[in-house]
Amino acid sequence: MHGLLLAAAGLLSLPLHVIAHPQPSTNLAGRGVDLDAYRMADRSSYMNSDDMKLKQPGIASLSGGNYVDTATEVVKRMVPGMTFRMVDDHYVGESGISHVYFRQTMHGMDIDNSDFNVNIGKDGKVLSFGHSFYTGPAPDKAPVEKRDFSDPMKAFHGACKALNLPINADKATVQTMNEHEVMFMGTSGAMSDPQGKLCYMAKEDGTLALTWRVETDMGDNWLLSYVDAKETEKVHNVVDYVSHATYQVYRWPIPDPTEGKRETIENPWNLKTSPFTWISDGKTNYTTTRGNNAIAQANFDGGEDYLNNHRPNNKNLKFEYPYAPNMSPKSYIDASVTQLFYSANMVHDLYYMLGFTEKAGNFQVNNHGQGGKGNDFVILNAQDGSGTNNANFATPPDGKPGRMRVYIWTKAKPARDSSFEAGTVIHEYTHGLSNRLTGGPANAGCLNGMESGGMGEGWGDFFATAIRLKPNDNRNANYVHGEWVNNSPKGNRMYPYSTSLQTNPLVYTSCNKYNEVHAIGTVWGSMLYEVLWNLIDKHGKNDGPTPVFENGVPKDGKYLAMKLVMDGMAIQPCKPTFVQARDAIIDADMNLTKGSNRCEIWKAFAKR
């Protein structure tokens, strides 16, 4: 239900931190379009728990009733007179923090990049909140009343032309879904029928634009293009659900084929996190690489179909297939699909233990009454033919399947299959984690800014590195990203992850000279690597495959760091900055351990 209060102009009591970076030249799936030029600004504010006690004591002391009512009262007090709706993805996380999400509205329509998130602690009091609500002048009449917008088909053609999308729409028709949403039927070239939604968008110049949000799933890019509703040749911003990256070898338990031998593992699943096992969805038992959490198959042609693609099948459930690095990739495809399926399910189970559950928006077909939206396992495409020397992960909102494409790497002879590099799968899956947790499960576009997108890459590197740690490692251990797939000891990051400023000199101000998400992500990942070792030095390191908890808190520093970083994702605002994400991790520790690791976390960030 949409509120109908009048929107107020002026400034909110919280400052909006607008972060801008020069734009790199990242092409749109080889079609010569610089998607980074269309990124939204990271314009959220965040009120952490310390600041709130000082600056908003009335909000900090709010409690009573249920957490949804408390969160709604926070929004009403902080943005009086503004209209908004509650998004239907609120939940209580495994750490006891309640997360509630709101979207600003205007004349009954969403302002699509104006969000408010409120975090309620275990004690029922407000822990923190963040927002990016629009505060400028409001249009006096609803555009629907004035019909002051173009035909959606014109906007669709405008998006296709501006972004050079290979979609044929000569015979396309518009099917109305509701007052503000349409579907474009009869097109070809996209992986599903494109959709359109009439909505507002807050621009960087402080004004409001009426737009058609055109959604097109192109495989390597899943785009939300905000086309001006009057001047349909103008595209204001683009959100891409797909995260692209190059990756490193990580241990699960073996990092790559050079560091160990394959072994046969019996029943590797954890029934607490995968109660139907990995090869059932609770309704159907499978004899192939398909189950509740994922479906894995070959995708040699890089196409959209996956259900009918080849996957290994064995009625005795013996997924044992030959592989050697000197074999040609297609000759070991069954081993590749099996490895990819195994690694992705291992990630699912670990992340579930750390808090990425059904109600938090994880990827499962059957949520067996635990909350969230089901029917969204991860589609795992091995040896995907749509590219080489890369991998990507598409994260739509909760209830729609995620999609991981894993490519062949041609930098060695014979070529190398990144399904056998655990870090590739961990990094890619972590894009799904961070996009579902940040801003809530229903909002998968919160990490599309330059700084927030960089953190998305850094989180992927951090989790893969933490999982990769070896028993004898200490804080002097350095980890290079991408040695095996790149066939290079230097990998494909600027510097190794290291606690030495001589080995890795990256600091916060390094971001000023970088304008690409992987470079910025390496800075963020380096900060988190410092947090990791400060907590390990204090609490020790569990070298087992799963965390051990005491009263909901991991007993060791490695898994505690992973837990706090994950909780921070759920606490931080949509489109966070480095500072806001840091504060969210500190607030996560305040909630989980009453701040017992505050000094260790602060020292880690202060160093960088």
Curated annotation (Swiss-Prot):
Enzyme's top EC category: hydrolase
UniProt-annotated glycosylation sites, renumbered to this chain: 285, 591
Superkingdom to which the source organism belongs: Eukaryota
Protein name: Extracellular metalloproteinase 5
Cellular location(s): Secreted
Keyword Chloroplast: no
Residues the record marks as active site: 428
Gene3D superfamilies assigned: 3.10.170.10, Neutral Protease Domain 2
Cofactor: Zn(2+)
Propeptide residues per the UniProt entry: 21-244
Family designation: Belongs to the peptidase M36 family.
Major localization listed first in the record, in broad terms: secreted
Signal peptide extent: 1-20
Cofactor binding remark: Binds 1 zinc ion per subunit.
Pfam families attached to this UniProt entry: FTP (PF07504), Peptidase_M36 (PF02128)
Signal recorded as keyword: yes
InterPro entries reported for this sequence: FTP_domain, Fungal_virulence_M36, Peptidase_M36, Peptidase_M4/M1_CTD_sf
SUPFAM superfamilies recorded: Metalloproteases ('zincins'), catalytic domain
EC number assigned by the record: 3.4.24.-
